Amino acid sequence: MGDLPTSQQALKVASSGRVILETGHPLPELGADEVLVRVACVALNPYDAKSVDMSPSPGATAGLDFAGEIVALGEAVNSSTRLAVGKRVCGFVFGNNPDRRDNGAFAEYVAVPASLVLCIPDSMTFLEAATLPCGLATTGTALYNSHNLGLPLLRPGSEVNSSNKSSTYVLVYGGGTATATIIIQVLRRSGFIPITTSSPHNFNRLQQLGAEATFDYHSPTCGSDLRDYTHNRLAFAIDCISSTDSMQICYEAIGTAGGRYVSLDPFPLNKHTRRSIRPVWLFSFTIFGSAIKWDTPYNFPARPDDRESAERWYAEIEAILATGELVTHPFQEETGGLSSVIDGIGAVRNGQITGYKLVYPIRNCAY
């Protein structure tokens, strides 16, 4: 690491709802099982605003999603064709981390476990790659982790028994979100049949991604329409909106026999109206295997099994990425680097960004 700078710029959490750009901060300490990445681009997610609003860690580096190139390897990471200095990668990190305030995506350098970083295929730019990591981490956790839907991780090309077709439907509520863009494609590749909800202007795009059917969530009969379409046998729902209304529609859609409901945020307990449904909300930061020490309800004990599950999932999704077939969510490239990310966080907080992600080049993102 002798050729690297001794300090960097980083967006630091200052107080509740406030991040500031600071200079002169040391690069993150590199763990033995980690790689150090020079950040090329970062992308914004709802939790970039939500986390600093609800559980700020003053002095911590903010940011979850990045793309860049490896500049150093931890002492326990074997240099290989896959992970070597100069390799283009993208990843998801635990920004605003009270236990590791020197590390987050919104900086010039970021450290990430070697087993939880994804190689970027030659056909994909840094800009495109930066839109993926949080959605990919959430997808694997939601669909295949035993704490959540617990679906079997089927290989691409797996055949679904047509006589049991209705039991393989999975409802993806909130099809217009970035996470749903990924989930729908992965479900289809895994042999399941995704159906989704959105505004009508998204219907064509979602069907091109692999959704078998799309439903207008504005319709007062949306829940019953979903149940009818799946012959009263829908057993799996993942809620990418996680509101009172979305939970109610998901519960209406799930068949009489019940099933599993996964929310991406804490769900309203008064909407858990059916004992036959097992509700759970996931927090993707558990994939790192360490305790999450944010304020309640965002505090979680360490889950080493989530780390193991995520590592298996990352190996699978990297192989899918390598095919060049995974479609990214629509995005808008912004200018101004890290300093402009502050305004972007405000726009996300205020609900001004819908249907696309904001991506910020930190340096040259042309390749």
From Swiss-Prot:
NADP(+) binds at Y47, D48, A49, K50, S199, P200, H201, N202, Y217, L264, D265, I353, T354. The keyword NADP applies. GO terms for molecular function: nucleotide binding; oxidoreductase activity, acting on NAD(P)H. It is an enzyme of class 1 (oxidoreductase). Coiled coil: none annotated. Disruption phenotype: Impairs the production of oxopyrrolidines A and B. InterPro entries: ADH-like_N, GroES-like_sf, NAD(P)-bd_dom_sf, PKS_ER, Trans-enoyl_RdTase-like. Its EC number is 1.-.-.-. The keyword tRNA processing does not apply. Keywords: NADP, Nucleotide-binding, Oxidoreductase. Pathway: Secondary metabolite biosynthesis. Belongs to the zinc-containing alcohol dehydrogenase family. Monomer. Trans-enoyl reductase; part of the gene cluster that mediates the biosynthesis of oxopyrrolidines, polyketide-amino acid hybrid compounds with feature structures of tetramic acid. The polyketide chain is first assembled by the highly reducing PKS module of opdA using acetyl-CoA as the starter unit and five malonyl-CoA as the extender units. OpdC acts as a trans-acting enoyl reductase and reduces the terminal alkenyl to alkane. The 17R in oxopyrrolidine A and 15R, 17S in oxopyrrolidine B are generated by non-stereospecific catalysis of the ketoreductase (KR) domain and enoyl reductases. PANTHER family: HYPOTHETICAL OXIDOREDUCTASE (EUROFUNG), TRANS-ENOYL REDUCTASE APDC. This is Trans-enoyl reductase opdC. The gene is opdC.
